[in-house]
């Protein structure tokens, strides 16, 4: 037996421990938590946030920055790092191209470049998130300061956080901030077409990412009970035992009712060019120019009401804007609707929409509006929480807000205004008219808001509650620690050289041309391949025994690794030594019998394949009739049953249901982590439906000319080569392109 496989025997006798890991080291008698936050979209820096510049730079951006600052000031925290995207774009500040940026003595921003260099809106980031996940795993693997928690914010970060968490065994906390299912529900209720919603928002990918994040989360932090009990409850992978309500807080040093004449003068000058009678009580809205914020409905309600036009001004602080031609389409459409409504109802002199304001002016704007006995208005179609409501309330400004989501809970605690159905134009107009009609009630609401925010929504209370949860949950975290043990185990010998070529037995090696096969055989055994220390592996959906028999007919060199059963089994070399660590990792929450039972009544759509095609971690079906609706149906059924399983379709007819943590892509990353082989030195071949996941991220890939059309969407990936030839000839072309079997490869 070789030294390498003796090592396997030793490792296989190690305990596959899934008990919670050790709590962090103590600093000055207190636990020194190391926290990694993922905030991927928008424009994020340590100061002078460009809030409202676009739909992606809003309340979440401010919350993450303030949370990082506050956590860094706590003795219980050793370090806070916020991971975001590195952007190199002349349209935005050079600040966003700095790889590292300090926030505070114990907090920093770390930026990773993934996808194009230019600034992208969040819906365009999805194809590049696997690249970030691979980079982040590599960074943390090599770091001496691995975090105790990953906290992912929004669906995109949730997706990356889930991948990093399961690969490295780091507990994951997740905050959705807003949820895709709720957004879809609201947009459909407002008359939106599902196809158009999908095109604008990539809503299916977002919901899938949220389900993945929830499936891997040890802690889900929500802002309200309604968000926890109603919005998250619509997700099949949501476990209510993992959810805690920790309402965001308000910085009382910035948001308070005590104003001064200088700041009021500055605000008045900001608005003076718009308003004929600036002394009127304002109806104030502060938000991004986003469809979801529903500002045109507010303008229309104001324009239709003689009472409101006579009594109030309308002040819309919708972020900063420069040249409207540089705005994204959604922003332009929102502003155009506002301009059209102002013109239609002749609201000139009664509506203000300043082009610029500073972030430090926002508290003064609230106080100015309160001094004018105005109202704060939040007409959003959906509002997961509503941090601006707390800012307004802390400043003594009563409000009228949407009855969706967080505002209901905030106003029930604060008793400082009205909630209305903002989808009903008459209801919104009536609420605005009633709220401003009674001066004594306005005064009572103002006092109530200031007192309630101080009592229920202080920033200190938020941070204390947050840290208490982090420390308590860490002690009983159920995150699998197999990966953590592997990274801590000195492996020594590896079964691989410096590169690894993975060929698919079911496609590129299926019925190969004899000349092409001979060429591959010669290249794999050539001195140059030996000098390049190139290893060879086989991937297949078949069981190992069947795959070995088929492979023997090809007369190729023996592979160093077999990845079989659609990525659920890993075996090494001639001894066919199974990797028990991989089996232990993917077995978490896997319920094979429950999968079969859950799908047993779908006989009109699928039927079980023969027993020889089944596996311990794979349930295989044949489709009765291929079609685009089958995979979503299976996915929905599995989620509704609370099963941590993932369906995947290959060649339009073959459906496999695997554990949530298993796939060919994940198996490759497991090998990379276990044996220290860089992903950039692994070459995969793709051609079939279902291979799109395989070519994401850092591994190099060859897509043969006879590929399924679904792979055409991967042409933007930098490390994917689309060959001009089919099958094995296309593989040989790809090997030549990368010079993969040469001593000096393009990948080095």
Language model segments and positions:
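Short beta-strand scaffold positions
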Residues: 152, 222-223, 401, 538, ...
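Non-catalytic pre-domain segments flanking phosphatase-related domains
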Residues: 451, 455, 459-505, 522-529
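Active-site phosphate-binding/coordination module
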Residues: 519-611, 706
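Conserved acidic, metal-coordinating active-site core of Asp-based
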Residues: 596-697
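Mg2+-dependent phosphoryl-transfer enzymes with acidic/Ser/Thr/Gly-rich catalytic loops
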Residues: 658, 665-748
């Amino acid at each position: 037996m070789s030294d390498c496989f003796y090592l396997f025997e030793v490792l296989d006798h190690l305990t596959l421990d899934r008990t919670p890991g050790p709590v962090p080291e103590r600093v000055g008698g207190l636990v020194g938590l190391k926290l990694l936050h993922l905030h991927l979209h928008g424009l994020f820096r340590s100061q002078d946030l460009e809030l409202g510049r676009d739909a992606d730079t809003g309340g979440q951006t401010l919350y993450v920055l303030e949370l990082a600052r506050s956590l860094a000031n706590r003795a219980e925290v050793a370090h806070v790092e916020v991971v975001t995207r590195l952007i190199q774009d002349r349209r935005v500040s050079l600040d966003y191209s700095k790889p590292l940026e300090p926030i505070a003595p114990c907090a920093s921003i770390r930026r990773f470049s993934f996808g194009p260099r230019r600034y992208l809106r969040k819906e365009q980031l999805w194809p590049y998130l696997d690249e970030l996940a691979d980079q982040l795993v590599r960074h943390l693997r090599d770091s001496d300061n691995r975090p105790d928690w990953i906290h992912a914010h929004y669906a995109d970060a949730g997706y990356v956080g889930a991948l990093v968490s399961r690969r490295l065994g780091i507990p994951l906390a997740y905050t959705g901030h807003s949820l895709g299912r709720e957004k879809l529900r609201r947009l459909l209720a407002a008359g939106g077409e599902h196809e158009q919603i999908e095109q604008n928002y990539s809503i299916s990918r977002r919901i899938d990412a949220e389900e993945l994040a929830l499936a891997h989360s040890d802690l889900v932090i929500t802002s309200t009970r309604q968000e926890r009990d109603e919005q998250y409850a619509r997700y099949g992978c949501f476990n209510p035992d993992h959810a805690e309500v920790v309402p965001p807080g308000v910085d009382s040093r910035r948001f308070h009712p005590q104003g001064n004449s200088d700041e009021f003068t500055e605000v008045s000058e900001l608005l003076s060019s718009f308003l004929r009678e600036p002394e009127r009580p304002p109806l104030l809205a502060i938000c991004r120019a986003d469809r979801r914020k529903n500002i045109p409905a507010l303008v229309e309600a104001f324009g239709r009401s003689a009472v409101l036009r006579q009594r109030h001004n309308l002040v819309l602080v919708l972020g900063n804007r420069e040249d409207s031609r540089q705005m994204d389409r959604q922003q332009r459409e929102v502003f155009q609707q506002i301009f059209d409504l102002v013109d239609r109802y002749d609201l000139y002199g009664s509506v203000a929409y300043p082009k610029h304001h500073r972030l430090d002016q926002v508290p003064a704007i609230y106080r100015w509006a309160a001094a004018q006995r105005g109202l704060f208005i939040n007409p959003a179609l959906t509002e997961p929480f509503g941090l601006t409501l707390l800012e307004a309330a802390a400043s003594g400004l009563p409000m009228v807000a949407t009855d969706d989501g967080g505002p209901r809970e905030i106003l029930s605690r604060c008793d400082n205004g009205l909630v209305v159905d903002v989808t009903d134009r008459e209801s919104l107009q009536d609420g605005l008219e009633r709220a401003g009609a009674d001066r004594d009630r306005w005064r009572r609401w103002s006092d109530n808001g200031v007192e309630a925010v101080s009592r229920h929504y202080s920033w200190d209370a938020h941070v204390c509650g947050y840290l208490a949860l982090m420390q308590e949950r860490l002690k009983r975290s159920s995150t699998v620690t197999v990966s953590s043990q592997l990274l801590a185990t000195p492996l020594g010998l590896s079964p691989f050289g410096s590169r690894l070529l993975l060929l698919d037995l079911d496609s590129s090696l299926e019925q190969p041309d004899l000349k092409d096969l001979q060429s591959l055989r010669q290249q794999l055994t050539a001195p140059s391949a030996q000098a390049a220390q190139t290893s060879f592996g086989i991937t297949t959906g078949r069981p190992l025994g069947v795959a070995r028999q088929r492979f023997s007919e090809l007369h190729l060199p023996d592979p160093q690794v077999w990845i079989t059963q659609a990525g659920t089994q890993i075996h090494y070399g001639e001894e066919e030594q199974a990797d028990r660590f991989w089996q232990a990792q993917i077995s978490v929450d896997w319920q094979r019998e429950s999968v079969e039972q859950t799908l047993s009544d779908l006989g009109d759509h699928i039927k079980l394949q023969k027993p020889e095609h089944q596996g311990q971690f794979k349930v295989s079906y044949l489709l009765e009739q291929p079609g685009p609706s089958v995979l979503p149906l299976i996915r929905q059924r599995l989620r509704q049953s609370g099963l941590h399983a993932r369906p995947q379709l290959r060649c339009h007819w073959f459906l496999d249901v695997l554990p949530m943590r298993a796939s060919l892509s994940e198996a490759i990353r497991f090998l990379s982590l276990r044996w220290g082989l860089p992903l950039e030195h692994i070459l995969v071949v793709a051609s079939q439906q279902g291979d799109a996941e395989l070519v994401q991220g850092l591994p190099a890939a060859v897509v043969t000319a006879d590929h399924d059309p679904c792979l055409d969407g991967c042409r933007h990936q930098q490390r994917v080569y689309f060959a001009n030839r089919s099958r094995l000839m296309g593989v040989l072309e790809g090997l030549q392109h990368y010079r993969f079997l040469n001593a000096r490869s393009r990948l080095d």
